Amino acid sequence: MSLKDVKVNFLVDMATDLFMARSISEVTIKDIAIAAQVGEATIYRYFGSKQNIVVHAAMKIQGIVSKDFFNLEKGKNGFEKLKVFYESYYEIFIKHPDFYKFLSEFDAYVSVEDSSITNPYESAIDSYKNFYMDAYELGLKDGSIRKQNDIEMFYFSTTQALLELAKKLAFKKAVLNQDNRIEKTSELQCLIAIILQSLNNLWV
């Protein structure tokens, strides 16, 4: 790793910590420079803009998620692999709810920016779909998974539903009274159970 890479990683670490502690919209380049004890010009020299450092932070979080979760090798058959896949959303919520909070802010932040800046992040996210489809095909072959009419639609619909629910639950303040009556983790577990029931071809 070059000296430049070390410096970039350090600045991304500082920025990510600030984004997590506060919010993406509140943190400025000046804040990051002060935390890293460098000049603002250094931040701009390495990243060019706040938008780029935000994407780098998202990539860092994605790397942690990829390394620590979604280990589909744990599954013995196609269904068990997809069970690991969906339950990873729950495990992330338990261990890193701030990741979902960041993702919610990230989506809102980049929605008004040049979409091309998120291309590296989107490419990394696409790899999850490839793992998912491989597990699905294995499940069809070993008989553990029930065939879906449109598996791509099923994939996007279910993952988006889980993401949106997790992002909503990651914000501690309840919006509605009913939000106080339902255990946050139970909501995620319930949705995951419904999804898995749709896929499981081995129910007795």
Model-identified regions with their sequence ranges:
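Hydrophobic alpha-helical connector segments
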Residues: 70-98, 151-158, 185-188
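C-terminal peripheral helix-coil segments that are non-catalytic and often amphipathic
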Residues: 91, 130, 134-142, 156-204
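Short secondary-structure transition hinges
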Residues: 91-131, 152-153
